[in-house]
């Protein structure tokens, strides 16, 4: 019942340090932690190699994004809305305190637009069947998300995690063109125990 995900944030070459990159952070936290609180304690002790956002959520609804640089970490808590709470991350830092560390300077494949689409959609469109509504969000039905038509940049996968039921819904590639399929491996492993 723990999800950990990452997004890259551009780092100036001179700021890269010895430490964990975002892929290893995700792997480490998934192997060592069992809750958002536990993952946060571990993450705050790790040396960070380069800029990234780490999204952490657990089956109890505790969720945060940690904006990380080699020199500083900042925790962004979930935003409460009428229909629940949400946390979102894109390929930039969204807190005012951390924006100065983002070397992309806005050249980040429309990160701000994607962030705004998620946050606005949660209050207006994400109701009823949350899995289906989130899939529609990722397909771009509510605004710009993953609709890249550039030959050198495309969506690798889009995933929706149901942490209470341990189910993953994944589109491998552009979710406008690829169907979301159910990945029940985690659910099945837990059921066998």
For each feature predicted by the language model, list its residue ranges.
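C-terminal, well-structured catalytic/ligand-binding subdomain of enzymes
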Residues: 2-193
């Amino acid at each position: 019942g723990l999800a950990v995900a990452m997004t890259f944030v551009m780092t100036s070459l001179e700021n890269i340090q010895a430490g964990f990159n975002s892929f290893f952070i995700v792997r480490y936290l998934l192997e060592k932690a069992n809750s958002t609180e536990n993952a946060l304690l571990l993450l705050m002790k790790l040396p960070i190699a380069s800029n990234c956002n780490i999204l952490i959520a657990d089956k109890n609804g505790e969720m945060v994004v940690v904006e990380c640089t080699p020199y500083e970490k900042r925790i962004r808590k979930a935003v409460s809305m009428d229909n629940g709470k949400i946390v979102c991350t894109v390929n930039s830092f969204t807190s005012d305190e951390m924006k100065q560390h983002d070397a992309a300077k806005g050249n980040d494949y429309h990160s701000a637009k994607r962030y705004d689409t998620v946050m606005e959609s949660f209050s207006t469109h994400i109701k009823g069947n949350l899995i289906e509504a989130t899939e529609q969000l990722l397909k771009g039905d509510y605004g710009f998300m993953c609709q890249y038509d550039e030959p050198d940049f495309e969506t690798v996968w889009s995933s929706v995690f149901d942490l209470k039921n341990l189910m993953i819904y994944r589109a491998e590639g552009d979710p406008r063109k690829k169907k979301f399929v159910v990945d029940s491996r985690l659910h099945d492993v837990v059921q066998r125990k």
